[in-house]
């Protein structure tokens, strides 16, 4: 057992809780399904990763930890859509500064994460298309990020 995670089903402010047995041991949910020759999507939540092709989850906001397992040039970081969350904003800014490919969610997406998008009627194919169109790197990522963040 590496970790376990629970999700609130109601309107709780605390939506997820993750308990890791060894906090220094970075494991990825879904690593056994990854094709390293293809683009690898890295999400925060295991549930989110199940709706994307070739995706893993970190079970926290440290998505860059996936680069310990995969070629950085193959990775796309898919953070939750939380422009007011200081931790997420800080992690995203660091990822941009370190030249990762990163998804900057468009304004039309009001949902917090991929799971919420599915619950609100988006198909996995629609989500994959949005992610493909709104993946940026370097200066373009920085420009999109400045417009996206709210802190």
Language model features: what each stretch is:
Residues 1-74, 87-89:
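Phosphate-handling DNA/RNA-contact segment within nucleic-acid enzymes
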Residues 42, 70, 74-79, 89-151:
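Replication-associated primase and helicase/ATPase modules
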């Amino acid at each position: 057992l590496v970790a376990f995670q629970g999700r609130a089903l109601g309107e709780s402010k605390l939506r997820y809780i993750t308990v890791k047995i060894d906090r220094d041991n970075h494991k990825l949910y879904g690593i056994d399904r990854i094709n390293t020759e293809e683009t690898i999507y890295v999400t925060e939540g295991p549930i989110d990763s199940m709706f994307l092709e070739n995706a893993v989850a970190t079970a926290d906001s440290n998505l860059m930890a996936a680069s310990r397992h995969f070629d950085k040039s193959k990775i796309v970081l898919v953070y939750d859509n939380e422009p007011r969350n200081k931790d997420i904003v800080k992690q995203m800014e660091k990822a941009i500064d370190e030249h990762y490919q990163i998804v900057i969610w468009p304004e039309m997406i009001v949902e917090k994460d991929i799971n919420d998008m599915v619950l609100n009627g988006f198909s996995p194919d629609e989500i994959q298309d949005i992610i493909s169109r709104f993946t940026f790197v370097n200066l373009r990522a920085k420009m999109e990020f400045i417009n996206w963040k709210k802190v």
